[in-house]
Amino acid sequence: MTLNIRVIAPDRTVWDANAEEVILPSSTGQVGILKGHIPLLTAIDIGVMRVRIEKEWQPIILLGGFAEVKDDKITILVNGAEEVSKIEIKAAKENLEKATKILNEARNDKDKIEATQNLRRARARIQAANVLAN
């Protein structure tokens, strides 16, 4: 019994496979989806999507978008996505420190918004790398 999951970014199809379970980073918190889930349309936040195939969890970083769940099919349209296998934890931690410093030094709303987005991406990269390491 599986779910069909498709993650589509503007430039490519990020994921197109079947899985037993998916946990989405929605704008209202984490949403777990199993076979037979009721129809759902939700906004996707910057964060880590976790996909369970058999007993293994695969993390994918989503950079905002929308998800539709219907008839055991999950279609996720995202602004962007990153594969975790390409993330170096040391660089991610350095980026988190840099993003935190830039946010603390931001002087106007535009800079604060941009710095906040960069901080959230950096946190998601670290979280995804940790999921993969466990």
UniProtKB/Swiss-Prot annotation:
Keyword Ion transport: yes
Residue ranges the record marks as coiled coil: none
GO cellular component: chloroplast thylakoid membrane; proton-transporting ATP synthase complex
Subunit-structure text: F-type ATPases have 2 components, CF(1) - the catalytic core - and CF(0) - the membrane proton channel. CF(1) has five subunits: alpha(3), beta(3), gamma(1), delta(1), epsilon(1). CF(0) has three main subunits: a, b and c.
Primary site of residence: plastid
Task of the protein: Produces ATP from ADP in the presence of a proton gradient across the membrane.
Subcellular location: Plastid, Chloroplast thylakoid membrane
UniProt xrefs under HAMAP family: ATP_synth_epsil_bac (MF_00530)
Protein name, as recorded: ATP synthase epsilon chain, chloroplastic
UniProt GO molecular function: ATP binding; proton-transporting ATP synthase activity, rotational mechanism
Membrane topology per record: Peripheral membrane protein
Cited Pfam families: ATP-synt_DE, ATP-synt_DE_N
CDD domains referenced in this protein's UniProt entry, alphabetically: F1-ATPase_delta
Keywords, sorted A to Z: ATP synthesis, CF(1), Chloroplast, Hydrogen ion transport, Ion transport, Membrane, Plastid, Thylakoid, Transport
Protein family (similarity comment): Belongs to the ATPase epsilon chain family.
Species per Swiss-Prot/TrEMBL record: Gracilaria tenuistipitata var. liui
Alphabetized InterPro entries for the sequence: ATP_synth_F1_dsu/esu, ATP_synth_F1_dsu/esu_N, ATP_synth_F1_esu_C, ATPsynth_dsu/esu_N
